[in-house]
């Protein structure tokens, strides 16, 4: 007679089904013994000490696998561990070993709350600044962002770009020692500087938030797409109109580069959580916030079978971050055109609820995209992700310019763009600018606008809920449905005038 295994060693809900699935594209796989990235949420019951729970989990890991097993867990936040495990190893871990005893399972379940997939996330101004009335606000209220610090969780920021030199955007004493690289390196200790940007996305986003074109315009080269006679796009150079400048929305704000995207524009949920935890740690060192807001111009499709909208580990960590007084701005995603349905007659129908994570986070300010200077005419960008969330909440919260936005260019973003290629006779520090599109750029406009607002309405620092409500209440209605435009187009001038 075959012995019946003891009941209870595995709770059905403790392991995400997605973790055990084969061939899931948005989970990191090493190719080594079918190991995949998992995010283990530790069980922190009331009264439990996080350090003691972490030590208990590491002892469990060693007892189950020994010293020659899978790679050691990596702490990414006080109650999250990043692990690389095979499906069999995951099962063994939550059972407390190979024997599958009730005692072993109870030990494991006393330490592990849930095993989540470590999802892969990807990266999603001269005329657009006036669209949100940032230029008028600077003239009227002197809202240039001075004294405000914003963290950019992205592919890094190229500190060598002249755009960030005039106002010490990255080198002021308030931020000089705060930059960090959280990207995963195959060789520990060989991480790249957070003030370099091979991918180029982070520098472009950062340039929309803060910084300013150098006064010496002889070093300025701006590339934009100009249709040819055959209606094909071609990169050409353009000049600034007389009296115009290229500036971030909050030119005098300071930025903290938290590099989370690798050179291909990818990152992991665990990496994001690690960076978010770092912001909390920085802000816990003293009475006043050192980092006032964060910008996340990235995201990924999320599996609704795994958790309700806004309840993923990453979304929950962002909600916790806003609870500490930090304003969180997130791009809605560029999936608005990816969910089209074709009817029997060949007609195409749009599909709603395409907001990507972490744009589903309830307390985050989630931003969609509109045309850079004619938003009333063209409305919401066709591929800007639409609401509502799948649990019925309205998203996005706001829209901002996101089409063909000119900002600082570097790395892969300008590679192959002939007009920006180095040439004989160029000064050594040419300021190169280029157009890019997406809700990544829209989120950066909102981050810059809020940084500008906080620089003159300092009583709102540390009040993310009040700031979100104020900007939504003061937004300009574009006459589109709230699932497309949210509260409307951000209006910095009206937000300042209403307080």
Each predicted region: which residue ranges?
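Active-site-adjacent substrate-recognition loops and nearby beta-strands
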Residues: 129-132, 138, 164-165, 272, ...
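Hydrolase catalytic cores
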Residues: 206-209, 260-262, 292-294, 402-483
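Catalytic cores of secreted or luminal carbohydrate-active enzymes
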Residues: 488-499
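Mature extracellular/periplasmic domains of secretome proteins
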Residues: 96-99, 103-109, 138-147, 197, ...
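Active-site-proximal beta-strand/loop segments in catalytic clefts of secreted hydrolases
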Residues: 43-44, 117-119, 152-156, 209-212, ...
């Amino acid at each position: 007679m075959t012995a019946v295994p003891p009941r209870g060693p595995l709770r059905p809900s403790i392991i995400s089904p997605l973790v055990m699935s084969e061939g899931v594209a948005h989970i990191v796989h090493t190719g080594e013994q079918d190991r995949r990235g998992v995010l283990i949420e530790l069980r922190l019951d009331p009264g439990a000490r996080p350090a003691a729970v972490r030590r208990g989990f590491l002892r469990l890991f060693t007892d189950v696998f020994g010293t020659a097993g899978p790679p050691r867990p990596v702490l990414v936040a006080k109650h999250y561990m990043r692990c690389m495990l095979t499906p069999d190893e995951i099962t063994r871990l939550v059972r407390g070993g190979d024997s599958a005893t009730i005692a072993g399972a109870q030990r494991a379940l006393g330490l592990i709350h849930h095993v989540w997939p470590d999802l892969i996330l990807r990266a999603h101004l001269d005329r657009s600044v006036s669209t949100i009335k940032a230029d008028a606000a600077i003239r009227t209220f002197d809202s240039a962002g001075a004294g405000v610090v914003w963290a950019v969780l992205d592919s890094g920021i190229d500190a060598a770009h002249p755009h960030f030199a005039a106002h010490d955007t990255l080198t002021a004493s308030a931020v000089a020692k705060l930059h960090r690289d959280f990207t995963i390196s195959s060789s520990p200790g060989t991480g790249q500087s957070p003030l370099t940007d091979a991918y180029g996305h982070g520098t472009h986003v950062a340039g929309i938030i803060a910084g300013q074109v150098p006064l010496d315009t002889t070093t300025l080269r701006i590339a934009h797409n100009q249709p040819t006679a055959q209606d094909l796009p071609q990169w050409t150079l353009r000049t600034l109109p007389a009296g115009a400048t290229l500036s971030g929305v909050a030119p005098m704000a300071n930025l903290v580069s938290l590099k989370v995207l690798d050179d291909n524009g990818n990152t992991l949920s665990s990496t994001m959580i690690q960076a978010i935890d770092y912001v909390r740690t920085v802000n816990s060192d003293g009475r006043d916030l050192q980092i006032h807001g964060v910008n996340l111009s990235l995201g990924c499709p999320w599996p609704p079978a795994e958790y309700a909208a806004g309840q993923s580990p990453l979304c929950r960590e962002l909600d916790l971050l806003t609870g500490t007084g930090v304003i969180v701005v997130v791009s809605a995603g560029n999936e608005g055109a990816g969910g089209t349905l074709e009817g029997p007659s060949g007609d195409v129908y749009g599909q709603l609820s395409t907001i990507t994570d972490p744009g589903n986070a309830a307390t985050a300010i989630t931003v969609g995209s509109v045309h850079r200077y004619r938003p009333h005419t063209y409305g919401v960008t066709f591929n800007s992700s639409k609401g509502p969330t799948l649990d019925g909440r309205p998203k996005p919260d706001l829209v901002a310019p996101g089409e063909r936005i000119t900002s600082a260019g570097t790395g892969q973003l300008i590679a192959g763009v002939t007009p920006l290629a180095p040439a004989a006779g160029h000064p050594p520090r040419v300021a190169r600018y280029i157009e890019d599109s997406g809700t990544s750029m829209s989120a950066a406009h909102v981050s810059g606008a809020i940084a500008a607002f906080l620089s003159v309405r300092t009583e709102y620092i540390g009040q993310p809920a009040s700031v979100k409500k104020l900007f939504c209440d003061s937004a300009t209605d574009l006459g589109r449905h709230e699932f497309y435009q949210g509260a409307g187009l951000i209006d910095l001038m009206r937000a300042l005038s209403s307080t």
